[in-house]
Amino acid sequence: MSKTDNRLMTFLRPSDKNLDAAKFSENLSSQNVLDFGNVNAMVVRTSNDNKYWIIGLSNGTIVLLSTEDSEKQTNNFYTLNADGETLPCSDLQPVPELNGQIRDNCHLILAVYVSGHARLWHYTGAMNSSRLLATITEERISNPSDAPVRTNAENVMNQILSCSCSYDGKRFVTGGVDCHLRVYDMKSRRRLRMCSSSFTKEKMDGHVMRICAVKYHPRGAVYEDYVHIFITGGWDDTIQIWDDRYLHSLWIYYGPHICGSDALEIESESNHILSSSWRRDKSILQVWKFNEELMIEFYNSAEHQGDELSIPTGREIINKQTGALYYCKPVAEIPQDAYDGPSKGYVAKWLGPYYIAFGGSDANILKLISRFTLNFMSAIFKIPGIFIGS
């Protein structure tokens, strides 16, 4: 792996004039800042072994920066570039290691792009040719509500906005502008199935607008019953629960307008969903109870057809949405702060057992919030640019 051109990014100290606009609460300070110039950082993750920051940029480049004394190793970073890719890397995730085992020869990253490509990278490969393991191309699928497409038009690519890997490392899901979720086999890179709405007036069992966030349930790392379960959120003001073996969603929470891949997350121990809505609602964060009873109903009703699940006619009890009064409203909400000004949410993160992170635009703020009191503990205000990911 060779080092890239140092002009790609610049390390800034907190005293630099570019950072004067950002304001830190008294109990928070900054060691350094990365400046990518006119290129925006769309998504930031850490590798499974915590040795690298993995940063997806708006020009399609992925940067890997060492987490070890990074302020002293200003040239210790690498890039992953696909030939001809110039559109944003909208989301990425390190592929979970099977059985939680970290192996040096399995440093894989799944990355998706607005260009309609999903790529699997082996980021410790010695050469560019050995790092890019696979490229998957998604064509946009027309929905009943879409405008008619001209017959002589070229194939339109799906803008992929989000992705997630199952915790057994065997599958991954992508979501984007065309409202369909594609489930792939990690080993063969073959598409297993397409999950979507029925697009009927009788029921809503899938997304009808773009999908901006996809998250596999973290309990899938331990419990077999959860290994196929994931949640999604999008522009249609819904959060939806899915099983990647079934064609339609199982449950829907109404309300949050999800606009970022980091605006939705599940906490394993409490089994609570955390969401952040991109609009000036009364609350910046919402906490929802995951519908465990739904899973019991679903598994008792579903029949196996190969590697898919189906619900026999007359036994579609999951669509009754039993217990709606308990599950349709948030169990907790964190209100907007009148002092800071309204903020539209892009980021909702569980940070261990004690904290929650929120990030949003308009006020351009990042907040650290106590899970017990729901009061904010520290914050960065007036971050330059638009805060869209973490």
Name each region found by the language model.
Residues 1-390:
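WD40-repeat beta-propeller superdomains and closely related acidic/aromatic-rich repeat-like regions
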